[in-house]
Every structure is written in C-alpha cells, then in structure tokens.
Regions:
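Alpha-helix capping and helix-coil boundary motifs
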Residues: 1, 67-69, 369
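Compositionally biased amphipathic helical and low-complexity segments enriched in hydrophobic
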Residues: 2, 11, 31-33
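Surface-exposed, short loops/turns at beta-strand junctions within beta-sandwich domains
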Residues: 2-3, 88-96
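Low-complexity, intrinsically disordered regions enriched in charged/polar residues
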Residues: 3-4, 24
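A eukaryote-biased signal for short, well-structured alpha-helical docking elements
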Residues: 6-17
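Histidine-/acidic-rich catalytic cores in large beta-rich domains
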Residues: 15-18, 24-58, 62-65, 81-85, ...
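Solvent-exposed serine/threonine-rich low-complexity stretches and specific carbohydrate-binding patches
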Residues: 70-80
Length: 430
C-alpha cells in the first residue's frame, strides 16, 4: 500500500499488477501545481490543480494573519471531478500565505488535508492608497466578507484599479487593469458590479466596451458597444432576468436641428451572453428635452452646464420591481415602466413644460407636511429640512421602500456659482 499516493498495487502470480484507490494520509502528492496570479491581473489570487484518486470535493481555507480580526476565508467547491482547478482568492500582498486544502467525500466527510504556502509580491500600482488606516472598526456589526472599492486614480480617464479590503483594512483582492493590454484603459465611470453568476462587469467609457471578468481577473466577455451603435456613459446594473442595463449615448441620435449629436440620453438592455440589445429607451420621448440652460448663461461652456446636446446626462439605472429607477444629472430621479412610460419624477418644478407637471412629486417637510413655499417648490431656494436633487447620481431602492441617492450639488438652486463655498457641497440622501 502506498498511502502517500492513495493507491494499493496488487501483484498477481503472473507478474501483472492492478492498482486500486486507497485511503491516504495527506494530499500533498495529489497537488499537481500552484500558480500565483494566473490571469496576470489579480496578484492576490492563485490557481491550485489537484488530481484526486476518487470523486470528491475540495474545501479551501485561506488563513488570516495571526492576531487579525478578519476570519479565515473558507469555501467548499461544488466540483467532484478527479482533476480540479481550485481558484484561491483573498491572499495577502507581500506575504507567505498559509493555505489548507481539505479533501472530502461526497457527503462532506474529511478524507485528508494538506497545507501549502503561497508567496505573493508587493502591490505595485501607483493608483492604490499608500496606506489604509482603520480609524474605527465595529467588528461585531460588520457583514461577512470584504469591502469593494472602485479606485478611480487621479482622473476619470485614469485606469481604474478596483480592490477589496478586509475588516483590518488590508487589501485582499485587486484587479490591476494596468497589467492587461486588453483592459488597461478601463476608467472609473461605470464602476464594477457583481453579477448573478459571481463574475464582475464594468463599462469602459474610454473605449466604449462592456467587459465581464471572473474573480481571478480572466476575461469572459468583451462587448464592443460602438459596433452596436452606442458609447458607454456612467452606469450599469443587472436585472432579475440577468440582463444588463446601461446608460449610454446613441451615436446616430441628433438634436432637433438634425446636425448636432445628442449625448447621455439613452438606456439599453443587453443580453450578457450573446451581446444582443434587447431594448432601448430614448429619454427624449420620456422627459422634457427642452428643459436645459437653466443655470447661469455666462457658464454655458462650463462642463457642468447643460446644453441642447447634453440636456439629460443620464447616470444611473436599476430595476425596481417590475419598473426601473433612473437618474439624470439635470432632470432628477425618475421611475419608468418597461414600455417607457414615466411613473413619477423627483425634480425641482421650475422650467418643466405643462404636460410634465402632473408627473412631478410634491415636496414634504421632515414631519410629512406639504411644503407650500413656491420658491422651494420651484427649486430657487432650499428650506431647513428639504432640498431637491441637484446633479443626482445612482439612486438605489432600499428594502424599506425608500430611495438612497447621491446628490452632487451641480447647479444647486439653478446657479453655477463656484465662488459661493456655502452652496457647494455633496451629500448622500435617503
């Protein structure tokens, strides 16, 4: 019996042999290879290949550093094949990581285990923070897992380096797009969303693609949106059917003069497997495209100002029940149905044409009583407990039926006065 190699060799009288699987003592000799950063984009990942004598599963443990609050990363894989490629995630940078592989039978009973070390390098990206210091941590209130940060670099056109930190503030996962010839120009504009299949998807606003990658950093899909007649803008999400929703511009769309190109006023639904466009919503047929130029006319060339082309500036889209919740920097927060019918709009009432007024929600004080001041309703001033969304972004429906959104503060009260420091602030609002 050869316990180390999980086999017993029977030798017959005629000299022939027959090998039968036998319970071994460890799985050291079942590990064929281990490779750190197999995709080239995730230096805190590894691939371990094992060859098992009989069907079974592998349970992985990535051990936390001694004295840390973050629990070990543990996962039992579903694969029961004889040869398995085990993805290892959650390694520490510049550290000789301790990994445990546990070989179980189909019922989950442990057969044997093995420990191995995986040495990682120092993270090199200049776009990562030089230091992460935990100021306050309430470990008993933290959800399991790690926190995803969409690191933008110094400019919106810089390569985005998304990473995850654990409860101790250590980086444990990263997508270093700069190491990829294919993706090194992906910016922060669309962030990074977790898909239902466990992969991640982002939109490349610099080269107008939609990219799906797995947790290791390997490319699954790379959809060219220009070939489909669109350029990427600011937001992507996934609906309950698995389709991708995205805010885009349509390259063939023109304003009323038939010459100037419209931008940032389309939403599309795309099949993430086939890359087919399943539906398109044109905001010109949903919102008031004549509602622009409300800010200081002396600042119409400013990038924060509106124009006939950039009248909406769509920047958020998510599914909400059977409908959709969207944001446009200059037009507010709105809910619409699959047919494109507007259910309601949260926006200052100023400058809307008459046919849209019935769609505008009325403002309330914090105690639920109606606000009656016409200037507050119009949006030309705030009151102590209410202000409209100004340059709103990324509205998210909450379990309690409320909406959480980011208020950028662009053009607050229809003014773009960047010298008025009291009027320039951003905030999250529920």
């Amino acid at each position: 019996m050869d316990a180390e190699n999980w086999k017993t060799t029977l030798t017959f009288a005629n000299g022939s042999t027959y090998v039968i699987p036998t319970l071994g003592t460890s799985i050291d000799n079942l590990i064929l290879s281990s490779t750190v950063n197999p995709s080239g984009c995730n230096p805190l990942s590894a691939s371990v290949v094992v060859k098992l004598p009989v069907l079974g599963r592998i349970k992985l443990i990535v051990h936390s550093k001694p004295g840390k609050h973050t629990p070990d990363v543990e996962y039992t894989f579903k694969d029961v094949g004889l040869k398995q490629n085990i993805p290892v995630l959650g390694l520490y940078p510049n550290y000789n990581n301790q990994i445990t592989l546990i070989y179980t039978d189909l019922q989950g009973n442990e057969r044997a285990r093995s420990n191995l070390k995986l040495q990682t390098k120092t993270l090199e990206s200049r776009r990562l923070p030089k230091e992460i210091r935990v100021v306050k941590a309430q470990y008993d209130r933290m959800e399991p897992g790690m926190n995803l940060v969409n690191s933008p670099g110094q400019d919106e056109t810089d390569t985005s380096i998304p990473y995850m930190i654990d409860a101790d503030g250590e980086i444990r996962w990263i997508l270093d797009w700069e190491k990829s010839d294919e993706h090194r120009y992906i910016g922060i504009g669309c962030g990074l969303i977790r898909m239902q299949n466990g992969h991640y998807m982002t939109g490349d606003g610099n080269h107008h693609r939609m990219v799906e990658v797995d947790m290791m950093g390997s490319t699954i899909h790379n959809w060219d949106m220009l070939e489909r007649g669109y350029t990427m803008h600011h937001a992507i999400s996934q609906d309950k059917q698995g389709n991708i929703l995205a805010t885009v511009s349509k390259t063939s769309a023109k304003i009323a003069n038939g010459k100037d190109v419209r931008i940032n006023d389309f939403i599309i639904m795309m099949d993430p497997e086939k890359g087919e466009i399943l539906q398109e919503w044109d905001l010109v047929h949903m919102l008031d495209s004549a509602r622009y130029g409300m800010t200081d006319y002396d600042l119409t060339s400013d990038p924060f100002a509106q124009s006939a082309s950039n009248w909406a500036h769509n920047n958020g889209i998510v599914e909400w029940g059977d409908d959709y919740l969207a944001t446009a920097r200059y037009q507010g927060i709105f809910k619409f149905n699959k047919a494109g019918g507007i259910e309601w709009i949260i926006s200052p009432h100023g400058y809307w044409r008459d046919k849209y007024l019935k769609l505008l929600l009325n403002p309330l004080h914090a105690d639920g009583t109606p606000i009656t001041d016409p200037e507050v309703i119009a949006g030309t001033k705030n009151c102590d407990d209410f202000e409209w969304p100004w340059g709103c972004h990324t509205a998210v429906p909450l379990p309690n039926g409320h909406i959480l959104y980011f208020n950028n503060g662009y053009g607050r009260n229809f003014k773009l006065d960047f010298t008025d420091r009291k009027n320039i602030y951003t905030c999250g609002i529920e």
